[in-house]
Amino acid sequence: MTQQVFFRPRPDWVGDVIPYSDGGELKLYYLHECRREPTCGTPWHLVTTTDLVHYEERGEVLPSGGDGAEDFNAYTGSVVRDDDGEYHLYYTANNPGRLAPDGRSLQLVAHATSTDLVTWVKHPEDTFGAPEGYDPADWRDPFVYRDPDGEGWSLILAARHSEGAERRRGVVARLVSDDLRTWRPTAPLWDPRRFITQECPELFRMGQWWYLVYSEFTDRFVTRYRMSRSPQGPWLAPERDTIDGRGFYAAKSAQWDGRRIFFGWIASRQDERDDGRWLWAGTLAALEAVQAADGTLDFRQPREVLEAYSQPDYHLRAPLRMGSAERYESAVLTDVLPRDVRIEADLEWEPGTREISLLIRTDSEGENGYVLRLEPALSRMVLDRWPRQVHGTEQWHISGDVPHFIELERPIDLAGRRAHIDVLIKNELLQCCVNRSVCLSASVYDHPSGRVGLAVLDGAATCTRLDTFLAS
């Protein structure tokens, strides 16, 4: 089965993605989430793409080991190729019935090999757990790479010290090997003493900089990165250290076509409601990392994805100016947006303007729907909605004191008083990018249809471009 732009193996879901670049083809291994009881275990499935637009499902490639096996759940890992052309897959082996001394289930590093990246042979004799000093229940997401300072191999993974402050034991542990089978611990790659742990770590080089990418759920559920001139650190925090918001998690990357492409999952919500709690796993999506002059990374939708929506649907014929220094103003188009559409807009605003918004799937009054709101004074963009959560029958029984989807905000420099906005909407999936540098992704359910519009609060703005495009 082939899907366009996004991928989900319906009726199931995509968990963590493990990208591997195989020439011009990207092999995207992913944790297959079935959400059935009794649980079916977690296998690796494979989907491939050669253009970031069309995704071809290849099915299961690394099965669950079965009810009694150490790898009943085959969780996140990585793939590398050795000097002889053999491929090595490292993954997290877990069985809820096999417990550590503290009563939590053990996590182990397991190994498999292949000659074609599709048929994998497991090597249970190579499985190993956490060494002394590390928590045996947090030993996951192995990422293997050739040691840039030597002739061997390094393996980093999400780990925790066995002692210390409960919420700050997280460490990116590191092991080394000469043969890709026997591993010995060495000094951690990064020991920030800040997070519960740093999930799905990966390391790559771009130009003169090295980047350490990880996902965390301590301060926020988000994928972050650090940067260094050396693969050993020190690891510096850029001003904007996140890849996306709460709705795009466990992002990992591969080099493709001379570019760095990240793949994560847009999180789903319980009962497919905007008020439903976030769930693990969702729909696969891609973002491209672009290196700025100072080494920091901007993120945007790949051009191939945007170009997949090239059939004109609506075009704003003349600039639209709106606003007032003392009130809110909005304007809404007449036609209902298609369910699968790209929106492109250019906005400019006067100094001191408080809010500039793109209304998405809104009603004719611009009242009910979703809002991508730019807030220059706060240097942020947020995804909002109306109505917010209703918890009673009275007029004031709404979450009016919750200013937006609280997890869905991104820092952004809006001092230039202009913004280029790219929005992709495909059924319940929403992916926004401002100035081709800051992205915000989400699943949205409560407003399945509506119009596009613009709004301004306490100031004035001009929309110089507003176009919508259908899939080609």
Q: Model-predicted segments: where are they?
A:
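Beta-rich carbohydrate-recognition and catalytic domains
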Residues: M1-D141, Y145-C200, R205-G245, I266-M322, ...
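Extracellular glycan-recognition regions
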Residues: T2-V5, R36, I243, D257-R260, ...
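Beta-strand scaffold of nucleotide-dependent catalytic cores
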Residues: F263
